[in-house]
């Protein structure tokens, strides 16, 4: 049976574009009857072993894990991960970039769950300069990039641009970074 995807075959994986991945997710939700919230739960939980392995190999293994979340479904994946880290007793902090009211339904439900648990979290306005990201990342064992994911169709600017620039700089300096979906500095349409 052939595939409608134009994905590129690699040794182990088929690579797809952002629009193709969105189509696969929609097909899974609609045709197979798997709710979006369950996909989000699976994606967030699947990040846990990799985050813990990266933390163990970090020179700052006892430092806090920072989960950087945007206001889309990719951010929702990060919120699920944050809940699981908190349940495991792992030192972590969730930073939501943007307004809570901008979260889609499934992500908002996960934000509410995280708040009910009392997990360390904060909301940062997109245009905020209140955080010195470079300084914060020196106190971080692993940064989880759940900011933009496959839905990005515009230029990165403002607070996101400053955050991503600091994240890339810190990564070059040794910070462990794990992306949910794809790194925010990559364009998903290619």
Predicted regions and their residues:
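Positively charged, low-complexity intrinsically disordered leader regions
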Residues: 2-61
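Glycine-rich phosphate/dinucleotide-binding loop and adjoining beta-alpha-beta core of small-molecule
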Residues: 3-16, 58-190
């Amino acid at each position: 049976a052939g595939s409608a995807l134009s994905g590129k075959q690699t040794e182990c994986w088929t690579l797809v574009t952002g629009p193709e991945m969105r189509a696969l997710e929609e097909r899974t939700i609609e045709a197979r009857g798997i709710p979006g919230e369950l996909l989000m739960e699976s994606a967030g939980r699947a990040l846990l072993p990799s985050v813990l392995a990266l933390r163990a190999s970090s020179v700052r293994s006892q430092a806090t894990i920072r989960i950087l979340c945007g206001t889309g479904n990719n951010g929702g994946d990060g919120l699920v991960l944050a809940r699981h880290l908190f349940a495991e007793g792992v030192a972590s902090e969730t930073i939501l970039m943007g307004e809570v009211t901008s979260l889609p339904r499934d992500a908002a439900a996960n934000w509410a769950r995280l708040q009910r648990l009392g997990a360390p979290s904060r909301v940062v306005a997109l245009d905020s300069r209140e955080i010195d990201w470079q300084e914060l990342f020196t106190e971080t064992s692993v940064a989880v990039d759940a900011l933009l994911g496959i839905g990005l169709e515009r230029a990165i600017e403002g607070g996101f641009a400053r955050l991503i620039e600091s994240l890339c700089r810190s990564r070059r300096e040794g910070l462990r970074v794990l992306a949910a979906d794809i790194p925010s500095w990559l364009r998903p349409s290619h």
